[in-house]
Structures are given as C-alpha cells and as structure tokens.
C-alpha cells in the first residue's frame, strides 16, 4: 500500500460517524413515511426479528437527554407507532416474524394522512 493510500485510509476512518450519529440519523429518517414504507415493503424488514429488536432498542431516544437532539420530533411518534404495531408478533420456526403482516399495509394506507397531520402539528 502506498503512503498516499495509507493516509487516505486514515482520514476516512477518522471521518466515520459515531454510533450515536448513525442511530440519530436513522431515528429521524422514520419521520419520512414513504421511506419507512420502502424499508418494510421492498426490503421486507417487517418480517425480520432483528429489525423489531432494533426498533425496540431505539426507544431510548424518547428520553429527554436524547430527545433534545431530535430535529424531527414526529420520528419519535413513528418509532412508537412501529413498536406498537410490532407488539405481539412472534418468531416462527423459520425465524420470520408472524402476526405483523398488517404493518406495511397500514403504513401504505394511512401514512399519507399521518404525514399531513404531522405537518399540521408543525404549523401550530
């Protein structure tokens, strides 16, 4: 490896986002209902138990010390909504979530309404 490549690699490593930054960005992306719908439908994440656990883990963003970093507070509403919708789902023998098949459909049918309501709350 050349000296220049080594220097570039070091610089890139120093610019990697922290776990905090990654999780903050992801939580805030939940305010974008079309993006959440994409994750659930196109990537089939609604069937993945790891995704359910990750959303549950992210609940700590509701704590005041973390919530103060949130620019899009509606993302916390969507996080809570998703965790509520996934509640009661179980993992079958194939390692796939069952009991949450309705989640993508709910977001597709009501997501636009929720986004409009979020915008209205911002205006108040």
From Swiss-Prot:
One of its GO terms (cellular component) is mediator complex. GO terms for biological process: regulation of DNA-templated transcription. Gene3D superfamilies: Mediator of RNA polymerase II, submodule Med31 (Soh1). Keywords: Activator, Nucleus, Transcription, Transcription regulation. Coiled coil: none annotated. It is found in: Nucleus. Component of the Mediator complex. This is Mediator of RNA polymerase II transcription subunit 31. It comes from Kluyveromyces lactis (strain ATCC 8585 / CBS 2359 / DSM 70799 / NBRC 1267 / NRRL Y-1140 / WM37). The gene is SOH1.
């Amino acid at each position: 490896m050349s000296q220049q490549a080594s220097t570039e690699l070091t610089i890139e490593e120093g610019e990697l986002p922290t776990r905090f930054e990654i999780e903050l960005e992801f939580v805030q992306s939940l305010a974008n209902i079309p993006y959440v719908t994409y994750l659930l439908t196109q990537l089939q994440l609604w069937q993945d138990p790891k995704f359910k656990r990750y959303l549950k883990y992210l609940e700590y963003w509701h704590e005041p010390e973390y919530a103060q970093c949130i620019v899009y507070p509606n993302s916390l509403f969507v996080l809570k909504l998703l965790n509520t919708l996934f509640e009661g789902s179980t993992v079958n023998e194939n390692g796939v979530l069952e009991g949450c098949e309705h989640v993508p459909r709910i977001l597709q049918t009501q997501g636009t309404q929720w986004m409009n309501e979020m915008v209205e709350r911002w205006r108040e």
